[in-house]
Swiss-Prot record:
Monomer. It comes from the Bacteria. It catalyses: glycine + O2 + H2O = glyoxylate + H2O2 + NH4(+); sarcosine + O2 + H2O = methylamine + glyoxylate + H2O2. Its EC number is 1.4.3.19. The keyword Flavoprotein applies. This is Glycine oxidase.
Amino acid sequence: MSKQVVVVGGGVIGLLTAFNLAAKVGQVVVCDQGEVGRESSWAGGGIVSPLYPWRYSPAVTALAHWSQDFYPQLGERLFASTGVDPEVHTTGLYWLDLDDEAEALAWAAREQRPLSAVDISAAYDAVPVLGPGFKHAIYMAGVANVRNPRLVKSLKAALLALPNVSLREHCQITGFVQEKGRVTGVQTADGVLAADEVVLSAGAWSGDLLRTLGLELPVEPVKGQMILFKCAEDFLPSMVLAKGRYAIPRRDGHILVGSTLEHAGYDKTPTADALESLKASAVELLPELEGATVVAHWAGLRPGSPEGIPYIGPVPGHEGLWLNCGHYRNGLVLAPASCQLFTDLLTGAEPIIDPAPYAPEGRLG
């Protein structure tokens, strides 16, 4: 297939879409308004699971399961080809004092996932630094986290090594070029960039771009703030989650604690209120963090969408335009499956899963 495909947006979805397409089409161009991988893909925690997977629709679950199984080999492949290790780090995850534990266990039995109730004493034995007072725990082995800044760095390096891929950073896309009802390129600040197919993977900004065609994509920015501590490498052996807040151990002893959910438009300014709230959650989960130095505090913008179900597929009435966006809190979680499904659809291959729940048709205003 000798097509030129332009991918608008260089987050993990756009980069992995380009990585997959590069083996199938003639030329791939990735455009990003800033540096690739510096928005929500960089800012998130990197847990390779929805925070509460049993609360999501079957559509999200199908993508999550495929992606979770694929991540280890993706990490190994990128490390081998680029020398940049995305650090897919399997630690397991403890959920503490859930209100819907029965639903979680029923979901696990139905989906055949290794999630089970554990005695709280076993949780404290496994995670001695866990804060006091927790009464109940469930645990899922095999849950990993990925160091997302390193993931996007490795994807960027992999793409730069491919002769048929080009990255255009600081490339402002202002709209789409159309001829006879077909999208034939994008309008940039420097002129027209022609394409046989255009993929919109611009995260929280996707709706703004689609609006230039008179279409309403119900994707909006949802701000999330995180903080980072530096501890001993063996300080926290597993991820822990309680009351909507989590702590994630990296291999080098960094501990991420997050996150907030804020509707603040496109403002990414870290706030003092969020810092204090996140520090309080950190100490409740891990009291030894009391008084510890917060080595970083940042914010990112998630692409909020109804029920977190992404839009994957062609845009009706605008031949040549495709969507792979709207993953909300789970862009990194769902990326491998979303991008493989998208590649299957664009190239006419047999899709890895039923694409119907993600189709833009009938879901745009």
